[in-house]
């Protein structure tokens, strides 16, 4: 029976590497997958899933008004799994579409993304995945400053911590840092 999986982690926790690994494992057995990512994430190009270690692959971009259920249902070849990167940027309707893919098409969906933003608020996609997912797993990484488990994301600009501003600002290592709670509130910058 298919399930909706939500795997979250801070920046640099290996979420995209995990997607690429899962896709490889399915495809190695001749089982097709669909990889999708938020259309908002254009760091490495539109419709590209890219890890910080240099692995990359094309993906179907998801806009907030995309009907993901119909897209998957109308594919000529039914996928064995749907893999979603940057799931924090999904709309509520996108997440409900993913649940329908699982429940009505019996296709497992694995969504990967951040849980909370730099102000420690849930992203819209994360909130609804936490509500609807059958299985929720944390992908762990360590705090950049002390090597404890990182649970938060610190936004920096010009080497200074930032706690206010727009929720969505596409960046990379240069603007977001995985940190523990202590170093979120008292960064060693």
UniProtKB/Swiss-Prot annotation:
It holds the Pfam family TK. It is found in: Cytoplasm. Zn(2+) binds at residues 143, 146, 180, 183. The active site is at residue 86. GO terms for biological process: DNA biosynthetic process; thymidine metabolic process. Keywords: ATP-binding, Cytoplasm, DNA synthesis, Kinase, Metal-binding, Nucleotide-binding, Transferase, Zinc. One of its GO terms (molecular function) is thymidine kinase activity. It catalyses: thymidine + ATP = dTMP + ADP + H(+). InterPro entries: P-loop_NTPase (IPR027417), Thymidine_kinase (IPR001267), Thymidine_kinase_CS (IPR020633). GO terms for cellular component: cytosol. Its EC number is 2.7.1.21. Homotetramer. Belongs to the thymidine kinase family. This is Thymidine kinase. It comes from Streptococcus pyogenes serotype M1.
């Amino acid at each position: 029976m298919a399930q909706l999986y939500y795997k979250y982690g801070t920046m640099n926790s290996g979420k995209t590497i995990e997607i690429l690994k899962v896709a490889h494992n399915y495809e190695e057995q001749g089982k097709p997958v669909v990889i999708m990512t938020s259309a908002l994430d254009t760091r490495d190009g539109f419709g590209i899933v890219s890890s910080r270690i240099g692995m990359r692959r094309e993906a179907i971009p998801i806009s907030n008004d995309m009907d993901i259920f119909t897209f998957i249902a109308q594919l000529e070849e039914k996928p064995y799994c749907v893999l979603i990167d940057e799931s924090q940027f999904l709309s509520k309707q996108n997440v409900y579409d993913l649940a329908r893919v699982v429940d009505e098409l019996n296709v497992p969906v694995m969504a990967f993304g951040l849980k909370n933003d730099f102000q420690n608020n849930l992203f819209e996609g994360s909130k609804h995945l936490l509500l609807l997912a059958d299985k929720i797993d944390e992908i762990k990484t360590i705090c950049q400053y002390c090597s404890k488990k990182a649970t938060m994301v610190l936004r920096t600009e010009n080497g200074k911590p930032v706690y206010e501003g727009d929720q969505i600002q596409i960046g990379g290592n240069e603007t977001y840092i995985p940190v523990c709670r202590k170093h979120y509130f008292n960064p060693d910058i």
